[in-house]
């Protein structure tokens, strides 16, 4: 996971020395908005936007889910990067269709030649203005949720105003402890930092499991944005985070209520097709040579996600 410094690519891993061994994630560098209003800089139009994703990445997975749920597959096209993220960062197996680039860092410098920062996915590109709209997944899914409704006719709302406070509270709790918590655990470089993140992670999972013992979903009786933001971490947990990131107190399959909830979400039409366990396992185990220097990718585990979820 390298970075750009004033437009020049550098193959450098995360520096945890100044943070006492703790992994600290950088903020997204592009945070503009598509808005359904006349005269706006970024208006919702069919075919105007292009999404760059990794099938391995939980943050990018969010955007693929919302693209599917909100009937945007015919309106926003996609480039999928290779699962291997080596010295050149995220790369394409074939030149991507807009500029013929083969590296994600070239997309960033296409938008801003002197860009400095990490080169991450997802990236939402605007073909009309030739720039990146956003590389912040939480904001891309909000745009997909609400700003294309007139175009698609799909008014399903995963961030309804009456539940917004609850959704935000869950998001604010789950992001540091679970979504980013698995990375804080796996990328920690001191025992103290690892154990701090590990304990917070499993405390949060215990809280979620207890909540799901009494509630159908996180914010109530309907699936919301908070559930999908949690899902993309849960679905990777037993496949990679338990072993690769040393998050091994319990598997998700050991949590009675979370496991049923995970299976229910996975079995919703179209969601399985956004989930690729080959890419997930290959990326983490093969790319993170500082954690897994042999680059051996495990054959297992066997995941039971398609049997009845038992949640009514």
Which residue ranges define each predicted feature?
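C-terminal alpha-helical interaction module
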Residues: 1-312
């Amino acid at each position: 996971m390298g970075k750009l410094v004033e437009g020049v690519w550098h193959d450098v891993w995360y520096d945890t020395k100044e943070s006492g061994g703790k992994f600290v994630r950088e903020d997204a560098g592009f945070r503009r908005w598509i808005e359904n209003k006349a005269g706006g800089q970024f208006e919702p139009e069919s075919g105007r936007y292009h999404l760059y994703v990794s099938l391995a990445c939980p943050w990018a997975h969010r955007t693929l889910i919302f693209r599917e749920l909100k009937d945007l597959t015919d309106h926003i096209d996609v480039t999928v990067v290779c699962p291997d993220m080596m010295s050149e960062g995220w790369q394409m197996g074939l030149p991507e269709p807009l500029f013929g680039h083969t590296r994600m860092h070239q997309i960033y410098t296409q938008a801003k030649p002197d860009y400095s920062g990490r080169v991450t996915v997802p990236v939402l590109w605007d073909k009309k203005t030739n720039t990146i709209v956003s590389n912040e997944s939480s904001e891309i899914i909000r745009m997909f949720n609400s700003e294309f409704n007139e175009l698609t006719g799909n008014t399903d709302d995963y961030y309804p105003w009456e539940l917004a406070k609850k959704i935000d509270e869950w998001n604010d709790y789950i992001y540091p402890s679970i979504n980013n918590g698995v990375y804080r655990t796996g990328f920690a470089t001191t025992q103290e930092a690892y154990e701090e993140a590990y304990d917070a992670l499993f405390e949060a999972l215990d809280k979620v499991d207890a909540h799901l013992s009494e509630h159908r979903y996180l914010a109530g009786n309907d699936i919301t944005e908070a559930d999908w933001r949690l899902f993309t971490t849960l679905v990777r947990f037993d496949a990679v985070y338990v072993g690769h990131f040393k998050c091994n107190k319990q598997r998700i399959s050991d949590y009675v209520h979370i496991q049923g909830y995970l299976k229910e979400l996975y079995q919703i039409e179209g969601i399985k097709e956004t989930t690729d366990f080959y890419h997930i396992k290959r990326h983490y185990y093969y790319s993170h040579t500082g954690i897994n220097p042999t680059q051996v990718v495990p054959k297992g585990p066997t995941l039971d996600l398609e049997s009845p979820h038992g949640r009514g």
